[in-house]
């Protein structure tokens, strides 16, 4: 199938949207909105003492990030992470202006979720000892596992944004 045929199909679908096409469009815009909202909320919470202290067991046991508390206080690191997360949210929301912004936001988001998923292997208490593997605790196990879905969503946002840039 050549590019002209794909373009014609896209125009036909846009002129005569089916329920599936409309549902997909709502899902795509919903994905951007949801991921940006999550970053604004989570990022904003990083400026609180409550959230800063909640990060300590995750970060301090991580071979990737365990060193940060030697350089920064718990509150400072949390605030820096908050700035990063709010910035990622702004970049993803920036899809309204340019797919270049959401491409960067999606890529940064994917990197952040790969990092947080690594905590599944370094944080004590992920496996529920009374049930054994593969049972995981509510916290931190299930709390961290949800990042697998957010990683997939981040990759989708980056890929969708890149596709939009390629088809301009």
What are these regions (language model features)?
Residues 2-168:
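Membrane-interface extramembranous regions
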């Amino acid at each position: 199938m050549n590019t002209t045929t794909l373009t014609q199909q896209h125009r036909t679908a846009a002129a005569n949207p089916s329920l599936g096409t409309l549902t997909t469009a709502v899902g795509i815009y919903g994905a951007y909105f949801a991921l940006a909202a999550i970053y604004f909320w989570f990022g904003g919470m990083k400026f609180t003492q409550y959230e800063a202290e909640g990060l300590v067991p995750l970060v301090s046991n991580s071979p990737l990030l365990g060193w940060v508390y030697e350089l920064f206080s718990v509150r400072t690191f949390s605030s820096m992470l908050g700035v990063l997360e709010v910035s990622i949210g702004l970049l993803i929301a920036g899809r309204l202006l340019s797919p270049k912004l959401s491409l960067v936001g999606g890529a940064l988001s994917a990197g952040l979720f790969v990092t947080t998923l690594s905590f599944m292997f370094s944080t004590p208490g992920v496996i529920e000892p009374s049930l054994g593997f593969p049972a995981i605790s509510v916290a931190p196990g299930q709390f961290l596992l949800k990042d697998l879905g957010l990683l997939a969503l981040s990759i989708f946002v980056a890929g969708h944004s890149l596709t939009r840039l390629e088809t301009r």
